[in-house]
Structure formats: structure tokens, C-alpha cells
């Protein structure tokens, strides 16, 4: 093998290329690689944090939904209880009002009955006085007495 000038020139140019690459190109390549590695690591870390936050948010949302369901159940139970109380109160008020109306009607009926009885008493006493007056004016006759009493009884 002959070592000639071309081979030496190629070795020198290769050495210059290596020196130039390590001095000027290689630091930029390493910097770009390190930057890319850092960006990828940050992205993976952010993805992991996002996954953890999603899990936590899912858990919190489940807790919130459960709390809301419990509150809704409680509110519905209270509303049903209040509704039944209102119904019972309305029934009691209606019964009291009905009893009051019935008592008023009975009192009014009793007053009307008493007025009617009083009116009948006055009419009976007036008829009795009129009958006694007629009997006293006429002669005492049994047949006439009986006829007058029958007439008075028919008028009653």
C-alpha cells in the first residue's frame, strides 16, 4: 500500500472536518437534542399531572354528585312531609269550618223551631180564647160544644 499525497490530504481534510464539526456543529446539535429531550420530558410530566388531575376531578365530581343526590333526597322528603302537613292542616281547617257551619245551621234551625212553636202557641191560645168566648156566648149545649171543639181541632 502506497501512502501518497491524496491519502494524506484526505486524512487532513477529515481531521479538519472532525475539528470543525466538534467545535461549531456538534454543540448546536447537542443543544437541540437536550432541548428536545427536555421538551419531551416536560410533556410527559404534564401528561402525568393531567391524568392525576383528571382522576382527582372525576373523584370530586362523583362526590359532588353523591352529595347532590343526598340533598335532593332530603329536600324531596321534606317537601313530601310539608305537603302532608299542609293536607292534614287543610283537612283539620275544613272539618273545623264544617263543624262551625253545622253548629250555626243547627242553632238557626233551633231558633226557627222555637219561633214556630211560639207562633203556634200564640195561635193556639188565640184560638182557645176565641173558642171559650164562643162557648160562653152560646147556650150550654153538649152537641154545640162538641161541634165547636171539633171545629177548633180542625183549625189547629
From Swiss-Prot:
Keywords: ATP synthesis, Cell inner membrane, Cell membrane, CF(0), Hydrogen ion transport, Ion transport, Membrane, Transmembrane, Transmembrane helix, Transport. The chain crosses the membrane at residues 7-29. It is found in: Cell inner membrane. One of its GO terms (cellular component) is plasma membrane. Pfam families: ATP-synt_B (PF00430). Gene3D superfamilies: F1F0 ATP synthase subunit B, membrane domain (1.20.5.620). InterPro entries: ATP_synth_B-like_membr_sf, ATP_synth_b/b'su_bac/chlpt, ATP_synth_F0_bsu_bac, ATP_synthase_B_chain. GO terms for molecular function: proton-transporting ATP synthase activity, rotational mechanism; proton-transporting ATPase activity, rotational mechanism. PANTHER family: ATP SYNTHASE SUBUNIT B (PTHR33445:SF1), ATP SYNTHASE SUBUNIT B', CHLOROPLASTIC (PTHR33445). Belongs to the ATPase B chain family. F(1)F(0) ATP synthase produces ATP from ADP in the presence of a proton or sodium gradient. F-type ATPases consist of two structural domains, F(1) containing the extramembraneous catalytic core and F(0) containing the membrane proton channel, linked together by a central stalk and a peripheral stalk. During catalysis, ATP synthesis in the catalytic domain of F(1) is coupled via a rotary mechanism of the central stalk subunits to proton translocation. Component of the F(0) channel, it forms part of the peripheral stalk, linking F(1) to F(0). F-type ATPases have 2 components, F(1) - the catalytic core - and F(0) - the membrane proton channel. F(1) has five subunits: alpha(3), beta(3), gamma(1), delta(1), epsilon(1). F(0) has three main subunits: a(1), b(2) and c(10-14). The alpha and beta chains form an alternating ring which encloses part of the gamma chain. F(1) is attached to F(0) by a central stalk formed by the gamma and epsilon chains, while a peripheral stalk is formed by the delta and b chains. HAMAP family: ATP_synth_b_bprime. This is ATP synthase subunit b. The lineage of its organism: Bacteria, Pseudomonadati, Pseudomonadota, Betaproteobacteria, Nitrosomonadales.
